[in-house]
Amino acid sequence: MKAVWYEANGAAEDVLVHGDMAHATPADSEVLVRLHASGVNPSDVKARAGSRPMGFDRVIPHSDGAGMVEAVGSGVDPSLVGSRVFVRNGQWQRASGTAAEYVTLAEGLVHALPDAASFAVGAALGIPALTAAHAVLKDGPVDGQTVLVHGGGGTVARLAIQIATDSGARVIATTGDNDKVDWIRDAGAVAVLDYRDPDLVSAVAAAAGSGGVGRIIDGECGRNLATSIDIISTKGTIVGYGSVLTPAPELAFLKMMFKEVTLTSILVYLLAESAADAYASIVADMLERGVLDVAVAATLPLTEAAQAHRLVEAGDRRGAVILTID
């Protein structure tokens, strides 16, 4: 099979190799997927650059992908063969991810992809959409709540806005990019505020009204934590799904305690199978109804994996970066 791999950490153009290798056959309870698209996420790029030890002599990167089930192992329903699917956790604690023509994965890591969604869209679901759904719905229904989504122009954040809105929440978003304000509004945010505003707490309060903000979703939780604690309503919840810029923030514990605020972190790789199945069903339903815009910023062929990694590293984009595999 055609694949991209690396055998050392480093810059994408220095370490990513495109070539041929044999593909595995599915073991018991596994599924073999012929991939047509591979999603490139920030975590994939950081892993290649050396944010954590490789763990394996050779790594095929990327956790997300989409394609067709080609074969199944013992214990898996054979009627799955020929199904359109998206996959998750392809390279989580494994050597073989989705930057290849084939991947074998446990059945629980493979989810139905609606006909309404392209393979490129499917490859943008595993980490971004399931993270967004988990951030919104982890603690139950949000119908009637006001939810604040920081960094609303980010891939996960914009999906979270749509999922929260479809779930009956009223969504306020922040951004530091004026060019993305309308794009964020199009996702369902009723107000889009500049997170750099020194009066952001007051601006959010005015937008939220008397009910306040019951839930905050943040991909840079540490940087915004002090402000989020000031914003959140009594007994509200702050959900962090990332904190690269400020990985070890100070915590105003007493201020949190006297508002009985819940601060929770989530990691999509650790999702229970039942939760992942539930979120995948929600995402699939929204795709089928045409109410989930999964933005794809760029599609490139597998041979241009290094350029795809550079695009993700550059940061300023509208949506996911996808490799097509034909």
Task: Give, region by region, the residue ranges found by the protein language model.
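Short, glycine/polar-rich helix-capping loops at beta-to-alpha or helix-loop-helix junctions
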Residues: 98-99, 175-183, 248-253
